[in-house]
Amino acid sequence: MAEIIFIRISKKKLKKRKEPADYEGRTYTDYLEYKIQNPNIPTTEMDTVYNYQSGPYIQTFIFENTSFMIGILHENKTADSMSESLNRFQDKLSDKEYKSLFSLLLTDRGTEFAKPQQFEINMNTGEIRSKIFYCDPQQSSQKPHVENNHNFIREILPNGQDWNHLTQEKINLMFSHINSTPRESLGDKTPYEIFTFIYGKNLATKLNIQKIEKDEVCTTPRLLK
């Protein structure tokens, strides 16, 4: 006679997984709700680009409605290093300028951005300076502008290339050329033209971005040779 085996099936409902504490109130759904309530606060998408896990790393920022992108070179891919960029921007920009660009940040859940308080609060002064939200896991399409603009970086700094020759001055030069490239999405104007129309040339200069004449723009590896 065959042995009968009884399997007890639990009817206990599975609990919905809670968001990690650092992301509570900062999810992409929270971001969409925040944008509905604050439609006049522009979003700045933030990301990191690198070729090797050992670095170096380029922290990128792109400003809503402009396609204007800047980058900060880092040796370390940590929240301490990445949030320090905001400290430097605060030191360099006026309060009005900082708030116009960095009040609202949208990024992914990389470990280098995983300490939201360090981005939202100036740890030196205790001042609340920004609001940060995070895309859902593995959903880079939720910050499409910064992701798409990285294609320009890859034209100049191809995958697999050693980046140890990079300096912040070279990064600034690269983004000056990228921002001086006309875009169909901008009515064939350049990100530099749109950004300076909205914010002024002085602010672009403070961000170390210069206008490059269209016939002098180079978006190939030759630029940084």
Model-based region annotation:
Residues 1-148, 154-162, 167, 173-177, ...:
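Secondary-structure boundary/capping micro-motif
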